[in-house]
Amino acid sequence: MGLKINRPRRGSMGVYPRKRAADIVPRVRTWPEVNLGKPALLGFAAYKAGMLHAVVVEDRPTSPLYGKEVVRPVTVLDAPPLFIWGFRLYTLDPTNGYRRSIAEVWAPELPAYIRRVLTLPEKADVDKQMKKVEEFKDVAVDVRALVATQPHLSGIGKKTPELLEIPIGGVPSVDERIKFAVSLLGKTVSPKEVFTAGQLVDVIAVTKGKGYQGVIKRFGVTILPRWHKHRKGHRRTGTIGPQAPALMFTQPRPGQMGFHQRTEYNKRVVKIGDNGAEITPKSGFLHYGVIRGPYILIQGTVPGAKKRLVVLRHPARPPKKAPPAAEPQVVWLSSQSI
């Protein structure tokens, strides 16, 4: 007898409940501990612009195509510099072990577009805030930068920024992280200061929304034969479960599909550039526009629709056999947007 294949559904229970994401800005729940030898941000945020295809030289020694030119699909991310408007110190709460904010410092001068999402004080007392940092730095376990995107520098014609919290890591010393955070106050950070071409990153974004869908599209359930014994329907399950319990979550049911936050691990950075004009098609990216500043090319696909915010971070689960750390050699890049 052959192998018995029983696959009544194709949906994972690990992503329940399948409901709409609470916010279109991704919420990162896990940040890795990396040793970079110097303090740095552990993540970056960019906007999805579209896709191109590139001809690159295969640099994995174990590949049969090693040293030859291969075609790779790449996702283009519009990556304007992030503005650092503050930082926070966290400690561990002794009662439950959760992180708790103990000090916060804001930059003395903030741009006008921050007022679109924050109510700013008339005058920020930085000296008073820094005294609190000095008081609690001995019990601090985490330092996180408060960053704002700059969509007015992107191609989407948007003015209201998104606010995120990105940890500062790379070194174990909290004092070094605090000094680095103070040096960044009121300044901008470009993608080249966070990532390098050739390395792996995790991409986190909210997927495309599909609305309310049936079990065929949502779970890939087999369509029933169209004959008289299936008169109650064809694009449905044979049964929705027993009378009791009344609802079984393992049973495929129609409902919301898409607009879920998802994480894809270990995507390779093909290239990081400063001039978006060199990769933008003549007519611009479809449904996006023109990239004017820094950009990031990611090998493969990235979750989400165009214009959606994508958060990149250092890999939380790096593979045992990582690709070469050197920048891939891009021979040719298409000029037609997908």
Swiss-Prot record:
It comes from the Archaea. Pfam families: Ribosomal_L3 (PF00297). The keyword Ribonucleoprotein applies. GO terms for biological process: translation. One of its GO terms (cellular component) is cytosolic large ribosomal subunit. GO terms for molecular function: rRNA binding; structural constituent of ribosome. PROSITE patterns: RIBOSOMAL_L3 (PS00474). InterPro entries: L3_arc_euk, Ribosomal_L3_dom_3_arc_sf, Ribosomal_uL3, Ribosomal_uL3_arc, Ribosomal_uL3_CS, Transl_B-barrel_sf. Transmembrane segments: none annotated. Keywords: Ribonucleoprotein, Ribosomal protein, RNA-binding, rRNA-binding. Gene3D superfamilies: 3.30.1430.10, Ribosomal protein L3, domain 3, Translation factors. Part of the 50S ribosomal subunit. Forms a cluster with proteins L14 and L24e. One of the primary rRNA binding proteins, it binds directly near the 3'-end of the 23S rRNA, where it nucleates assembly of the 50S subunit. NCBIfam families: L3_arch, PRK04231.1. This is Large ribosomal subunit protein uL3. It comes from Pyrobaculum neutrophilum (strain DSM 2338 / JCM 9278 / NBRC 100436 / V24Sta). The gene is rpl3.
